[in-house]
Curated annotation (Swiss-Prot):
The active site is at 233. The gene is rihC. It comes from Escherichia coli O139:H28 (strain E24377A / ETEC). One of its GO terms (cellular component) is cytosol. GO terms for molecular function: purine nucleosidase activity; uridine nucleosidase activity. Keywords: Glycosidase, Hydrolase. This is Non-specific ribonucleoside hydrolase RihC. Hydrolyzes both purine and pyrimidine ribonucleosides with a broad-substrate specificity. GO terms for biological process: purine nucleobase metabolic process; purine nucleoside catabolic process; pyrimidine nucleobase metabolic process.
Length: 304
């Protein structure tokens, strides 16, 4: 039986690979997509998500979400993903539009209609998820679990200790981590290991139309990384759903720092139980890299 999931995303180049896997992995049933400001503005992430859905002829409803963090000024990753977030490939024009309600309400409505609890997957800042949990607490029993790409037990990627998705809206992340729902955190500890090799990347144009599109996106903004390998950060959240045996998880207490001058956005992961607090997150700490690479090749081969 396929696992029903809702995907909250901010595409973004590596988001495109994660979306492909969510659509084409035969084990998954992607029922709803929502967008959030993150890598680029929410208007651009929505446009990019709709372009991808049209490219794959996927009839999946999409709702536009939060344009700004809960309390602080927006930050983006334009330096990584470019001004549009997904330049480098000429997508066909289309007439698709997002749903007419905010993302968190679309998630609420879909959860309440679902015949069984649904797994939420968040691969951008957690603003929409925090709004859902704070404004619609009655939805919690209908959430099977939340799987996120975000955070780190060690080094960061936008500050010395903070990972971008958490640092983009620390207050939202703190709200989510305090919520009591089951959380699986695929942070930089594993995503920095999730590398597609230059040899595999070179085969993408001959794989299928998805391979050609992804190769064009990668080459446009990450041409240097094409020679050393590309980290598939967001894809790890999807991979865990399908191939959890590839990941080593440890239950830990995790809090999000929201006050520190230099540490805001840091996920404080109490690996050794120093704080004496009960675990609230299953933290992915290691990855079977070869198994991950094999799975990626298998699922992208299906993304015709």
């Amino acid at each position: 039986m396929r696992l029903p999931i809702f995907l909250d995303t901010d595409p973004g180049i590596d988001d495109a690979v994660a979306i492909a896997a969510a659509i084409f992995a035969p084990e998954l049933d992607l029922q709803l997509m929502t967008t959030v400001a993150g890598n680029v503005s929410v208007e651009k992430t929505t446009r990019n998500a709709l372009q991808l859905l049209h490219f794959w002829n996927a009839e999946i409803p999409l709702a536009q979400g939060a344009a700004v963090p809960l309390v602080r000024a927006p930050r983006d990753a334009v330096s990584v993903h470019g001004e549009s977030g997904m330049a480098g490939y000429d997508f066909v024009e289309h007439n698709r539009k997002p749903l007419g309600i905010p993302a968190f309400l679309a998630i609420r409505d879909a959860l309440m209609r679902a015949p069984e609890p649904v797994t939420l997957v968040a691969i951008g800042p957690l603003t929409n998820i925090a709004l859902l949990l704070s404004q619609c607490p009655e939805c919690k029993p209908y959430i099977r679990r939340l799987v996120i790409m975000g955070g780190s037990a060690g080094r960061g990627n936008c500050t010395p200790n903070a990972e971008f998705n958490i640092a983009a809206d620390p207050e939202a992340a703190a709200c989510v981590f305090r919520s009591g729902i089951e959380i699986v955190m695929c942070g930089l500890d594993v995503t920095n290991q999730a590398i597609l090799t230059p040899d595999y990347l070179a085969t993408l144009p001959e794989l299928n139309r998805t391979g050609k599109m992804l190769h064009a996106l990668f080459s446009h903004y990450r041409s240097g990384s094409m020679q050393s390998g590309l980290r598939m950060h967001d894809l790890c959240a999807i991979a865990w759903l399908v191939r959890p045996e590839l990941f080593t998880l440890k239950p830990c207490f995790v809090a999000v720092e929201t006050q520190g001058e230099f540490t805001s956005g840091t996920t404080v992961v109490d690996i050794d139980g120093c704080l004496g607090k009960p675990a609230n997150v299953k933290v992915a700490l290691d990855l079977d890299v070869k198994g991950f690479q094999q799975w990626v090749a298998e699922v992208l081969a299906l993304a015709s």
